[in-house]
A protein has these predicted regions:
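A helix-coil-helix interface module used to build multimeric assemblies
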Residues: 1-201, 206-213, 274-275, 286, ...
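Glycine-rich cofactor/substrate-binding loops
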Residues: 1-36, 97-98, 279-459
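A short linear-motif detector with a strong N-terminal bias
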Residues: 23, 80-82, 92-93, 236, ...
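Short runs of predominantly hydrophobic/aromatic residues within well-ordered alpha helices
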Residues: 37, 84, 88, 234-237, ...
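Structural signal for hydrophobic packing residues in well-ordered secondary-structure cores
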Residues: 45, 62-73, 91, 95-99, ...
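Conserved hydrophobic residue
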Residues: 49-50, 74, 263-264, 379, ...
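Charged, flexible cofactor/metal-binding loops and thiol motifs
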Residues: 117-124, 128, 143, 151, ...
């Protein structure tokens, strides 16, 4: 008989058992479920709600089960439905009647909310550690490439010269924001819901603050209906995971492009590439492509849970069983993606000579040419028009701006002088941009130093 079967006259249909059971995936919450039960039983004993002797037996029994779970010695039962009923049934089997007192003052509704919050906190911390590692790699690459000039792009067309360091620090800022988002997701999960009961609290004198203290929560939930029905904390994790995967995907897209023969900016390490079953010459950036592809999967997890939650009346509904599969899948996908991406990025070879050569094409110094005129008194819109005509002339003559003679330049505007050639070099174009956030090496160095300090202070 089910632990809840007293009201029923017959057993559930086998099809229902199979459809209803969640142990196939919520067994992942075993450690959280047992740890939460240990805290609950400890409090029940301290409050005199159950005999202290029984509380001690329960705690000892649960610790034994936890040890067996970690050792892989426990086999879960599908007909026990979920991790909560499995643990309780196993406990009662091991310690007898005392085990039946564990669920005093508790419902599976607040129990599963507790388990999910504990796991979400763990997942947030884990993800933050992985992001810190990736951020450190980005800082190292940036530090080594302060003077590696490359083209910056808009609309996937060469726009202005920047440095590889500046480009890497753009991704540093993205992943740094991800770090903050997971900190917010952690805070959202850091609420202890036990004591909410099924939906209306309990008549027992539970010490909820004591349970929160034992489990490392900063605060307790303040409404029992919300305590059992809130899944915002999972949505916040999924949202942060989706944005983080989007950043990984953008980075992967650039590496895929840069790895092509058309760009040749990078060489992917053999250990992070694959071949073709028919074309012997191929070396494919499959790792980056797969991360890009799996991003949609995490988006789907977020949208799936949002859709599940959007029509649910208060308080708990069985629909919410679906939250865990979406959460676990997103967590696993993100963790694998961050792990392999960071390892791959460490091995990427940046072809500095190709990047620097690429920066000199596409009139990337045209804006600096206009700025040259502006600094000599020409209104910006007039300077813009002059340089536009210069570019058109160069295209017709198959020349770059620096290929023109001073006499040719003066035909377009008399403000051009001999110093224009130094002013339009790729190095000069980068070094002149000396405001915070710009690509001049000393500005990027300041950003790197600030980034390292931030990582150290928030480790």
């Amino acid at each position: 008989m089910k632990l809840w079967g007293g009201r029923f006259s017959k057993a559930t249909d086998g099809l229902v058992d199979d459809f209803h059971s969640s142990i196939s995936f919520d067994q992942r919450l075993a450690e959280q479920d047992i740890t939460g039960s240990i805290a609950h039983a400890t409090m029940l004993g301290e409050q005199g709600i159950i005999p202290q002797e029984d509380a001690d037996k329960i705690v000892e029994g649960l610790r034994g089960i936890l040890a067996d779970v970690k050792a892989g010695k426990v086999h879960w039962m599908v007909d026990a439905e979920d991790i909560h009923m499995n643990v309780e049934a196993l406990l009662t089997e091991r310690i007898g009647e005392a085990g039946k007192r564990l669920h005093t003052g508790r419902s599976r509704n607040d129990q599963v909310a507790l388990d999910c919050r504990m796991y979400a906190k763990l997942a947030c911390k884990e993800t933050q550690e992985m992001l810190r590692e990736l951020l450190s790699v980005l800082l190292d690459i940036a530090q080594d490439n302060l003077h590696t000039i490359m083209p910056g792009y808009t609309h996937l067309q060469k726009a202005q010269p920047i440095t590889l360091a500046h480009h890497m620090m753009a991704y540093f800022q993205m992943f740094r924001r991800d770090l903050d988002r997971f900190a917010h997701a952690y805070d959202a999960a850091d609420v202890m819901p036990l004591g909410s009961g099924a939906l209306a609290g309990t008549t027992y004198p539970l010490n909820r603050e004591r349970v929160a203290e034992l489990l490392g929560f900063s605060r307790i939930s303040m409404n029992s209906l919300d305590g059992v029905s809130d899944r915002d904390f999972l949505l916040e994790y999924l949202s942060a995971a989706s944005i983080c995967m989007m950043h990984l995907s953008r980075f992967c897209e650039e590496l895929i492009l840069w790895n092509t023969n058309e760009f040749r900016f990078v060489e992917m390490d053999d250990a992070f590439a694959t071949g073709s079953s028919i074309m012997p010459q191929k070396k494919n950036p499959d790792v980056a492509e797969l991360i890009r592809g799996k991003t949609g999967r995490v988006y789907g997890d977020l949208m799936g849970l949002l859709t599940t939650m959007k029509g649910l009346p208060l308080a708990y509904n069985k629909d919410m069983q679906a939250d865990k599969e979406a959460f676990f899948d997103a967590r696993d996908t993100l963790v694998k993606g961050l792990t392999v991406f960071t390892a791959m990025l460490r091995t990427v070879t940046f072809r500095k000579d190709v990047m620097e050569k690429g920066a000199s094409g596409g009139f990337t110094n045209a804006t600096d040419c206009a700025d040259y005129l502006v600094k000599r008194g020409v209104p910006f819109r007039d300077a813009h028009a002059v340089v536009g005509r210069l570019v058109a002339h160069c295209l017709n003559e198959n020349k770059a701006l620096l290929d023109l003679s001073l006499d040719e330049l003066k035909q377009f505007h008399p403000a051009f002088e001999a110093d224009v050639f130094d002013d339009l070099s790729m190095l000069s174009c980068v070094e002149k941009r000396r405001i915070p956030g710009a690509p001049a090496p000393d500005m990027v160095q300041a950003a790197i130093d600030e980034g390292r300090k931030s990582l150290e202070e928030n480790a």
